[in-house]
Structure formats: C-alpha cells, structure tokens
Design a protein with these regions (language model features):
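Short amphipathic alpha-helix that is part of the acyltransferase structural core
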Residues: 1-24, 109-151
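An N-terminal domain-start capping segment
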Residues: 7, 31, 74-78
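A short, sequence-level motif marking secondary-structure junctions
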Residues: 9-10, 53-57, 175-176
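Acyl-donor-binding surface of acyltransferase catalytic domains
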Residues: 25, 36-133
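Short loop/turn motifs at secondary-structure junctions and domain boundaries
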Residues: 29-32, 149-153
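Short beta-strand-initiation
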Residues: 35, 46-47, 156, 168
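Generic recognition of cysteine residues
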Residues: 52, 79, 136, 160, ...
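A conserved beta-strand-loop-helix scaffold within acyl/acetyltransferase catalytic domains
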Residues: 150-188
Length: 189
C-alpha cells in the first residue's frame, strides 16, 4: 500500500537525502517547495525511506539507504498509474531494482553538424522578466517545472541574448537549491 506524505510534512524526509544525487538541485527545489511533486514513504509519522516523484518529467528520486524490496514494491505500484524516470544514485542505494520492472526506452540521438555561418552581432544580455518570458521559445519547460510564469520569476531566473527584439539565445537557471544551480543554455544552433 502506498503511503503519500502530506505536503506539510515534507520536512520529515529532507534528512533522508544526504548523499548527493544526479540532478540534486532539482530534487532539493522540490523538497524546499519550489516545484510540485509527491512523496511516498514507509511511515507517515516517522519516515525512514522515501520515493519522491516530481511533476517535472516525473523524475523520481529514492532516499539514501532505502530497502531495495520496499523501493521495488513502491515503484511497481506507482508505475501502475504513472510513467517514472528514476534518477538512480548507486552511492545512496547500491543495489539496483530487479530486472523486469523497468521499461527500457531505446534512444539513439544523432545530430549531424553543419557549418554554421556566423556573423558578428551586437546583442544585449537581458534578465528574463514577465514580458521577455512570453517571447521565449523554451518557456513551456519552465512552466512544467514551476506551473506559472510568476512562480518561475519568483523562484528561478534566466537571461537572454537579445538583438533588437529578437531572442538569439536563452539561458535558464531553473533549479537553484542545495547550493548548486542547474544551468541550461539554448541557442539557435
């Protein structure tokens, strides 16, 4: 049976994530309440294990030293209704879940590089504000994480290289938590 930790008790699981994980700042942005998600635990009043499922691409984080059988059972139950992308830290939970509960998604990305004609431009670097946000090509990913433009502008930030009124490049610091910031730069190339 899945036990969902009430949002107001999320502080009870922060101590269960001491070992640094891949995408750690995304996890801590959730634990600090900046982005939405759900936490499943072994005990509502005194959790010793947790699985956090973020709304952001359903990224899923497993707490340090969680019992592998509990993790497997929890993930299998969640997967009955949700697609998960589990971020696995072998230093936090050394044993991987048994084969068969995961769905392997084969992926092969091939990007053929062509010479890009470059030209000198004069661009201004502008902080993303409410007006500039509306013009950004990648704003939907920020809305996926923060649900509203206002939440993004309050809890994260970004910059654009702008020539006239045209955005040449977008740069987002979407997740700034646990003393680290995830920074992504998107260019036309």
């Amino acid at each position: 049976m899945l036990l969902q930790l009430p949002e107001e008790n999320k502080h009870l699981v922060k101590g269960l994530f001491k070992k640094r994980q891949p995408n750690n700042s995304v996890l801590w942005s959730y634990l600090y309440g900046d982005i939405p998600g759900i936490t499943y635990v072994d005990s509502i009043s005194a959790p010793s294990m947790a699985v956090c499922v973020l709304r952001f691409f359903n990224w899923t984080f497993v707490s340090d030293n969680a019992d592998i059988s509990w993790v497997e059972e929890t993930i299998q139950e969640i997967c009955k209704t949700e697609y998960l992308q589990v971020v696995w830290n072998p230093l936090a939970v050394p044993q991987k879940p048994v084969k068969g509960i995961e769905a392997v998604i084969p992926r092969f990305d091939f990007t053929e590089r062509h010479e890009v004609k470059r030209k000198e431009i004069q661009a201004d670097i502008r902080l993303i504000d409410s007006g500039l946000f509306e013009k950004c090509e990648w704003k939907d990913i920020q809305l996926l994480a923060y649900t509203t433009k206002e939440n993004f502008l309050e809890k994260a930030f970004g910059f654009c290289a702008v020539q006239g009124e045209e955005i040449c490049c977008e740069c987002y610091a979407s997740f700034a938590a646990d003393s680290y910031t995830e920074l992504g730069v998107i260019t036309a190339e």
